[in-house]
């Protein structure tokens, strides 16, 4: 996304100003996701629908993968997403490394911390041991991957700021897959599946 944006919107690029139309592709709404799941599994539960939304964020590609794998319920969806060879396991890395370039390790660390609940710059800086202000600004403004949120009950003029990931798929990927890469390298995917199932209720509750 950011690469295409630079090609057409950066004054230094040869194609600057030649864009004749812009189409923004947005994820499916929950209503559309519900219709898709109902077409494949009329007896789906609200838990199945929630899991589909949390795993895919409404992105057509990810929904299609699950539907083609006949992963229509929560357990099947999680099992497929975390199974050996699943496209879900490498998607975050494949999608973002080329975007971030040589700084990808710093960006990945920041996104992983936010997904794990370290949502203030002070917390992130203290763990990474460097000022991450410029990285956070890029993640918000250039890549549109995070956004600022105000804590509940904060005063309107409060400067307290927290960050959250905007994409549900990436939130799941950084929370469970990227942070447990060592388990996957040992090919013990079943342990990761058990970990996700153990923490799923708390994780899904935070996103409702």
Place the predicted regions along the sequence by residue.
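A short alpha->loop->secondary-structure connector
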Residues: 10-20
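Short, motif-level signal for alpha-helix interfacial/capping segments enriched in acidic residues
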Residues: 8, 37-39, 144-147
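Small/polar loops that bind or transfer phosphate-bearing groups
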Residues: 25, 54, 127
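Accessory nucleic acid-recognition modules appended to NTPase machines
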Residues: 62-208
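The conserved phosphate-sensing helix
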Residues: 44-49, 53-65, 104-107
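Short acidic/polar capping segments at secondary-structure boundaries
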Residues: 1-2, 28-30, 152
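Sensor-1/coupling segment of RecA-like P-loop NTPase cores
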Residues: 1-12
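Conserved small helical "lid"/interfacial subdomain of P-loop NTPases
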Residues: 20-48
């Amino acid at each position: 996304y950011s690469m295409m944006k630079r090609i057409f919107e950066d004054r230094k690029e040869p194609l600057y100003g030649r864009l004749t139309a812009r189409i923004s592709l947005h994820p499916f709404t929950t209503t559309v996701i519900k219709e898709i799941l109902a077409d494949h599994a009329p007896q789906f539960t609200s838990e199945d629908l929630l899991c589909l939304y949390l795993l895919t964020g409404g992105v057509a590609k990810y929904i299609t993968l699950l539907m083609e794998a006949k992963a229509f319920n929560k357990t099947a969806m999680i099992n497929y997403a975390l199974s050996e060879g699943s496209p879900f396991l490498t998607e975050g890395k494949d999608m973002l490394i080329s975007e971030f370039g040589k700084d990808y390790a710093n960006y990945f660390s920041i996104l992983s911390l936010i997904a794990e609940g370290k949502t203030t710059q002070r917390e992130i800086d203290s763990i990474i041991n460097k000022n991450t202000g410029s990285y956070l600004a890029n993640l918000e403004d250039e890549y549109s991957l995070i956004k600022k949120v105000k804590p509940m009950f904060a005063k309107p003029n409060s400067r307290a700021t927290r960050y959250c990931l905007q994409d549900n798929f990436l939130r799941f990927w950084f929370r469970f897959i990227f942070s447990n890469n060592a388990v996957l390298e040992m090919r013990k995917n079943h342990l990761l599946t058990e970990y996700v199932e153990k923490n799923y209720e708390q994780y899904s509750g935070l996103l409702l």
